[in-house]
A protein has these predicted regions:
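Intrinsically disordered, low-complexity activation-like regions
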Residues: 1-173, 194-541
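Nuclear receptor C-terminal ligand-binding domain
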Residues: 182, 186-191, 230
Length: 541
């Protein structure tokens, strides 16, 4: 079978997760169709040019890639994949999709499939002895397969289309140009956490500003523009998380305008591959804002302390179980309730019909409860990992680092109130949050074989934060191995090379902090850990 990999590579992928191995491959035609050269056989009739319809092979490749996208990419871009997944492409209307969008979907699907096919080979880099995963800007270039030239061909066509859109005055600030640039940003992140995504982020920012700003576009109620804005918003926020405080500028403060839209276009995180509840994403935004404000020596430290305490309280008081219960039921209920809902036109029913419908509703409710129970605990653990990761980011940057840098020890910084009768010092709160994060991650990854509904594949950022906040000593070796091993597996699950880039960065941080003899209170600050000349990475999806 002509495909993206030979049998040995397929076996490698199967070793990672047999239950998730795609049942079919997209056939692409590289040199000689991806097959080994063979001697020509005399007398064998060859097909003549023109027997296939015009563009038949290109159309078939496009449809195959769209089908792959719907079946293997879309399910991993939402908290729970249901029939209502808004990211699925309607194949019956594929001819109405702009060519440039189709080109990006083809490139994305083939890249996803190639990375998954080579996941075992790629993710074992740096596992020999004490060797490290090297930091590479273009890890994608090392992958080999017949689909590679096809991927770059379609990617090049996309870039040409972008240039054409931007060269025309009437379209350079249009919906299509904005959507293409934001999608290209996601494609760059898929291929490398160190890729050219910052350039696309700034280009999208310029278009949004030209069109009246984020608030104006977010209230247009255009579903396609809304999806693009969500991706832009998330990358902008998480880019600030990974930016040293002294490099932040006034644009960080403008992120507060996103807060009003966390329940509308972002939908409280349930339709995103970064399913961070709105309360917690708002906390990240406000942490970024306080970090940026703290650069100014004229800022009132007492006021910053007060705001920092409020942020901590909002994170610590968040109820992950309640949030999960609400959203899991919302996500699972449409498919179950549709078949059992009584007709609104049927108003005249006798008592037996009413009893029958009542029994049907009881059965449907029981089925819904069973479905919710099957995934509720798993999704709760994922939500808790995000909550504890945000808590660690808050404690590290607003409490531990600011106290060290300012030399102050005010009551707000010296202790953190978890309840009316219990106070923990910041160091103890940090250790407790890290322990809870690791415990939730272990519970989540213990059910890795759950199948397609397993949401542990969305734990990229919590894993990275756990790694950032660990001491490099021998007592944490097992947990560091767990974090790195899980990130390596995400290369396969997500069809994304960024998790491997995250491993390389964490290993570098651990090595630097170990050499510096930092542990406990003497650990490097958040900003000091981010100082990597020439490296600008993003590690959350």
């Amino acid at each position: 079978m002509s495909g993206l990999e030979d049998d040995s590579h397929n076996q490698h992928a199967l070793q990672l997760l047999p239950s998730q191995q795609p049942p079919q491959w997209i056939a692409v035609h590289g040199p000689n169709g991806g097959r080994r050269p063979r001697a020509a056989r005399p007398g064998v009739p060859r097909p003549r040019a023109g027997l296939d319809p015009i563009d038949y092979k290109n159309h078939k490749l496009t449809l195959d890639c769209l089908d792959y996208y719907n079946n293997f990419v879309c399910p991993d871009m939402v908290l729970l994949d249901t029939t209502a997944n808004p990211l699925r492409v309607p194949l019956e209307f594929w001819r109405y999709i702009p060519d440039v969008v189709l080109d990006m979907l083809v490139s994305t699907s083939l890249t996803h499939q190639l990375i998954r096919a080579k996941a075992h080979e790629v993710s074992t880099i740096g596992m020999e002895g004490n060797s490290l995963v090297p930091i590479k800007r273009h890890r994608m270039s090392a992958l080999q397969g017949p689909s590679v030239p096809v991927i770059y061909k379609y990617h090049q066509r996309t870039l040409m289309a972008v240039n054409q859109e931007l060269s025309k005055t009437e379209s350079r600030y249009g919906d299509l140009a904005l959507g293409i640039i934001i999608t290209l940003m996601r494609v760059e992140i898929q291929q490398s956490a160190f890729g050219a995504w910052p350039a696309h982020l700034e280009a999208a920012r310029a278009i949004i500003a030209q069109r009246g700003g984020f608030n104006r576009l977010a209230t247009m109620e255009d579903v396609y523009v809304g999806e693009g804005l969500v991706n832009f918003m998330l990358v902008d926020i998480m880019n600030s998380v990974m930016t040293p405080t002294w490099l932040m500028d006034e644009r960080t403060a403008t992120q507060t305008e996103y807060i009003a839209h966390l329940h509308t276009i972002y939908k409280d995180g349930r339709d995103s591959d970064f399913p961070c509840p709105a309360t917690l994403l708002e906390a990240i935004i406000r942490i970024n804002d306080v970090r940026a404000l703290s650069r100014d020596e004229d800022q009132d430290e007492a006021e910053l302390d007060r705001v920092s305490g409020q942020i901590f309280t909002s994170i610590a008081s968040f109820n992950a179980a309640d949030w999960t219960r609400t959203h899991v039921r919302t996500l699972l209920s449409p498919g179950v309730l549709t078949t059992s809902s009584p007709s609104s036109d049927d108003t005249a029913r006798d008592s037996s019909d009413e009893q029958l419908h009542s029994e049907s509703r009881d059965v449907a409710d029981k089925g819904l409860d069973d479905a919710v129970a099957a995934v509720h605990d798993m999704c709760t653990d994922l939500t808790k990992t995000i909550q504890y990761a945000v808590l660690l980011y808050c404690l590290r940057t607003l409490h531990m680092d600011r106290r060290t840098s300012s030399g102050m020890s005010s009551p707000q910084l010296a202790s953190v109130w978890l309840s009316d009768d219990m106070a923990l010092d910041v160091e103890s709160a940090h250790r407790s949050a890290l322990d809870m994060l690791l415990a939730a991650l272990h519970r989540l990854w213990d059910v890795e074989a759950k199948g397609k509904d397993w949401c542990g594949k969305l734990s990229f950022w919590p894993l990275f934060i756990a790694g950032m906040e660990m001491d490099p000593g021998p007592e944490t070796q097992a947990e560091r191995d767990f974090v790195c091993g899980s990130l390596r597996k995400l290369v396969y699950y997500l069809g994304d090379l960024s998790p491997l880039d995250a491993v390389s960065v964490l290993q570098l941080i651990w090595r630097r902090t170990a050499v510096g003899g930092c542990s406990g209170r003497q650990r490097f600050s958040w900003d000091e850990r981010l100082v990597m000349p020439g490296i600008r990475g993003l590690y959350f999806f």
